[in-house]
Curated annotation (Swiss-Prot):
RNA-binding protein that mediates pre-mRNA alternative splicing regulation. Plays a role in the regulation of cell proliferation, differentiation and migration. Positive regulator of EPO-dependent erythropoiesis. Participates in cell differentiation regulation by repressing tissue-specific exons. Promotes FAS exon 6 skipping. Binds RNA, preferentially to both poly(G) and poly(U). There is a cross-link at residues 65, 216 (Glycyl lysine isopeptide (Lys-Gly) (interchain with G-Cter in SUMO2)). This is Polypyrimidine tract-binding protein 3. GO terms for molecular function: mRNA binding; RNA binding. The modification N-acetylmethionine is found at residue 1. The lineage of its organism: Eukaryota, Metazoa, Chordata, Craniata, Vertebrata. The modification Phosphotyrosine is found at residue 127. One of its GO terms (biological process) is regulation of RNA splicing.
Length: 552
């Protein structure tokens, strides 16, 4: 460890703590300990202790186990989707690096993203943690010329003033005034491509704000708006020409002449991820005339990535089961989503990086109202829940074990941040690999339940249509399995008695076994689903409740 300490103090790292490199690895297999000599070179042969608490968030991040031949630009590329990278310190001899983001918020977003999804550089996993240091001071230090050159190049690209290739050509660069909107055409559309599929793929390269899908000239097309033109550039650079599914659904990506999208409705054709309050509308949204005209425009077409001097085309995103964006410079393979995705079992990016981690830690629950059964019903919307454990001594926390890591990721993505019984639920991946049942005679108060063989599992049948009807929580619920004798008033009164305010209701015209009911808020709908899913309606019919993608 002395070697690391000496090197870091020599290069002028501004210390925020007396401990150096002592915090726990956020997404690594073990915790680094400052007293263990082998942390200097990332030696896996040593056993690392788990006796150190994680560092508090810092805009300086510590990267471990970086490849010995990695470039400065490749390290920088890990941080670019999350914000501006302001400094870099490489310790190649120790397979380590320090990356400084412009803000602590950007660093937190980056760590949160890479917690369940281990990033790869040159096909090698890289582990990221907060540093004890609050700032990197590398002025006038030897061997920093390459790092500073890479940072300056990236800064120039982000401001649109320099070609990535370092020459006069504008090929593969972010042009001045380049649009954050991409125009996407799907060729060889053998399998359906949904708005959710596009969001999953393109969100790997930055924050997706809006998507509009449409069909023109018998081709499925989309307009997709990023928060930043740089994100759009990287997405086009990596994804243009790639296949979504094996040997089909090829992405053809151009830059749009539009600089912003006007989304009027949130439905299966269009989505504004910044405006969850938008109505569903009927069918394809109406478009403003300039936008409609733009559908036929070629857009600002940038040439394929020409290869930058020292700048990696790969953004360092992890390979995953199914959908993968390899992080090997210059080698972008197909985005092959496994065939199981066609039946709804799409691989969630990064889930393969946490084998067997199907347990979620759910926090900030209302201890007076939450029950294991309630969590089973709610999380069961997004996968088959096997076990639930509410903490005996801290009843606002619980563990939820899903059938697999994909389902855990899906439930976490949809439910974390939702309000439930007056509190904002938080869900993260747990360090536990399974929920243990209480030993015989152990006091538990019924807080641990095994639902492994529950008949209420929604996804136990392979290829079930339920896989195609997974939607985020909304104020509108989809009701099914309604017997013929049950009336509109019967169902309205059922929800009113459960404490809900019913705003609208309608039966499906072609099938009165199904209906939509719109409640006063998303929180009301979540609580109603917990309360009334599987409610006995008589005539051997139990009500089925799920979130709807539609509004009334």
């Amino acid at each position: 460890m002395d070697g690391v300490v000496t090197d870091l103090i020599t290069v002028g790292l501004k210390r925020g703590s007396d401990e150096l490199l002592s915090s726990g690895i956020i997404n690594g297999p073990f915790t680094m300990n400052s007293s263990t000599p082998s942390t200097a070179n990332g030696n896996d042969s040593k056993k690392f202790k788990r006796d150190r608490p994680p560092c508090s968030p810092s805009r300086v991040l510590h990267l471990r186990k970086i490849p010995c031949d990695v470039t400065e630009a490749e390290i920088i590329s890990l941080g670019l989707p999350f914000g501006k990278v302001t400094n870099l310190l490489m310790l190649k001899g120790k397979s380590q690096a320090f990356l400084e983001m412009a803000s602590e918020e950007a660093a937190v977003t980056m760590v949160n993203y890479y917690t369940p999804i281990t990033p790869h550089l040159r096909s090698q996993p890289v582990y990221i943690q907060y540093s004890n240091h609050r700032e990197l001071k590398t002025d006038n230090l030897p061997n920093q010329a390459r790092a500073q050159a890479a940072l300056q190049a990236v800064s120039a690209v982000q401001s649109g003033s320099l070609a990535l290739s370092g020459g006069p050509s504008n090929e593969g660069t972010v042009l001045p005034g380049q649009s954050p909107v991409l125009r996407i055409i799907i060729e060889n559309l053998f399998y359906p491509v949904t708005l959710e599929v596009l969001h999953q793929i393109f969100s790997k390269f930055g924050t997706v704000l809006k998507i509009i899908t449409f069909t023109k000239n018998n081709q499925f097309q989309a307009l997709l708006q990023y928060a930043d033109p740089v994100n759009a550039h990287y997405a086009k650079m990596a994804l243009d020409g790639q296949n979504i599914y094996n040997a089909c659904c090829t992405l053809r990506i151009d830059f749009s002449k539009l600089t912003s999208l006007n989304v009027k409705y949130n439905n299966d054709k269009s989505r504004d991820f910044t405006r969850l309050d938008l109505p569903t509308g009927d069918g394809q949204p109406s478009l403003e005339p300039p936008m409609a005209a733009a559908f036929g425009a070629p857009g600002i077409i940038s040439s394929p990535y020409a290869g930058a001097a020292g700048f990696a085309p790969a953004i360092g995103f992890p390979q995953a089961t199914g959908l993968s964006v390899p992080a090997v410079p210059g080698a972008l393979g197909p985005l092959t989503i496994t065939s199981s995705a066609v039946t709804g079992r799409m691989a969630i990016p990064g889930a393969s990086g946490i084998p067997g981690n199907s347990v979620l830690l759910v926090t900030n629950l209302n201890p007076d109202l939450i029950t294991p059964h309630g969590l089973f019903i709610l999380f069961g919307v997004y996968g088959d829940v096997h076990r639930v454990k509410i903490m005996f001594n801290k009843k606002e926390n619980a563990l939820v074990q899903m059938a697999d890591a994909n389902q855990a990721q899906l439930a976490m993505n949809h439910l974390s941040g939702q309000r439930l019984y007056g509190k904002v639920l938080r869900a993260t991946l747990s360090k536990h690999q399974a929920v243990q049942l209480p030993r015989e005679g152990q006091e538990d108060q019924g807080l641990t339940k095994d639902f492994s063989n529950s008949p209420l599992h929604r996804f136990k049948k392979p290829g079930s249509k339920n896989f195609q009807n997974i939607f985020p929580p909304s104020a509108t619920l989809h009701l099914s399995n309604i017997p013929p004798s049950v009336t509109v008033d019967d169902l309205k009164n059922l929800f009113i008695e459960a404490g809900c305010s019913v705003k609208a209701f309608k039966f499906f015209q072609k099938d009165r076994k199904m209906a939509l009911i719109q409640l006063g808020s998303v929180e009301e709908a979540i609580q109603a689903l917990i309360e009334l899913h599987n409610h006995d309606l008589g005539e051997n019919h139990h009500l089925r409740v799920s979130f709807s993608k539609s509004t009334i």
